[in-house]
Regions:
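Positively charged n-region of N-terminal signal peptides that target proteins for export
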Residues: 1-4
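Bacterial N-terminal signal peptides
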Residues: 8-16
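Solvent-exposed loop and capping/linker segments of extracellular ligand-binding repeat ectodomains
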Residues: 20-201
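Short amphipathic alpha-helical "recognition" segments used for binding
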Residues: 6-7, 37
Length: 201
C-alpha cells in the first residue's frame, strides 16, 4: 500500500526575497531529504506567483510515489508547479529519477552512466522503456503549471534503458483554476487538458 507524503518537506536551494539587486541563494537544508522524497523550492523576486515546486526527486522506493504538493512554504502560498529561474529562464516541473539511478551506478558499475533527459516521445526505437507511475496531489492554491514530461536514458553495455515517470493527478475540489478527472488535469475555464505531463493510461 502506498504511503502518502507528509506535508513537511525540505528545501535545498531557495531564491529568497532580499535587499540586493541580484538573486540570493541560501542552502537551508544540508541533506535535502524528507521522509518520502525531496522537493526543490524557489522564490521569484519579481514574480507575483509566489512560491513554486521546481521538481520532485524520487529515491527509487515504489511505495514513495504519492507526491503531495504542500499548500505553503512558511507563510508563502505555493501557487505554481514549475516557473522561471533568475530573470526569466524557464524551469518546468518534472519528476527526477536520476538521483536514484546515480546511486545505483555507484553501487553497480554495470548500470552505466546518465546520458540524457528527454521527452518520452523522443526515446529511440529499440530502447527498453521502464515506466513508474506517480500520483500528484494538487492543493486549492495551485494557479499555474509549467510541466515537462521527462525520460532518463541510461546506457548499459551498449543497451539503452529509458526510465519514464507517468502521472495521475488528484486536484483539490476547491481549486478555482484546475480540476482533475480520471487521473488527468483540466482547466476549469474551457475544459482543456493541461499539457506537459506524461499521463498514466
Amino acid at each position: 500500500m502506498k504511503k502518502p507524503l507528509i506535508l513537511a518537506f525540505s528545501v535545498s536551494m531557495a531564491l529568497l526575497l532580499c535587499g540586493c539587486t541580484s538573486y540570493c541563494y541560501e542552502d537551508t537544508v544540508s541533506d535535502m531529504k524528507i521522509m518520502y522524497g525531496s522537493y526543490f523550492m524557489f522564490f521569484l523576486k519579481y514574480n507575483p506567483d509566489g512560491a513554486a515546486v521546481s521538481h520532485y526527486k524520487w529515491d527509487g522506493d515504489p511505495e514513495k510515489t504519492d507526491i503531495i504538493i504542500p499548500e505553503k512554504y512558511g507563510r508563502q502560498k505555493i501557487k505554481c508547479l514549475g516557473g522561471y529561474w533568475g530573470k526569466g529562464a524557464p524551469s518546468p516541473f518534472f519528476i527526477d529519477c536520476s538521483s536514484y539511478l546515480d546511486i545505483k551506478s555507484d553501487v553497480d558499475e554495470t548500470v552505466g552512466s546518465l546520458t540524457t533527459s528527454m521527452d518520452p516521445s523522443m526515446v529511440e526505437p529499440g530502447t527498453k522503456v521502464v515506466y513508474t507511475d506517480f500520483t500528484i496531489h494538487l492543493s486549492k492554491y495551485i494557479e499555474k503549471i509549467y510541466a515537462r514530461a521527462d525520460a532518463t536514458v541510461y546506457t548499459v553495455k551498449g543497451e539503452k534503458t529509458a526510465y519514464c515517470p507517468r502521472v495521475s493527478i488528484i486536484c483539490d475540489e476547491d481549486n478555482k483554476t484546475f480540476y482533475s478527472k480520471d487521473g488527468k488535469l483540466y482547466y476549469r475555464q474551457d475544459d482543456t487538458l493541461v499539457d506537459g505531463f506524461n499521463y498514466a493510461p
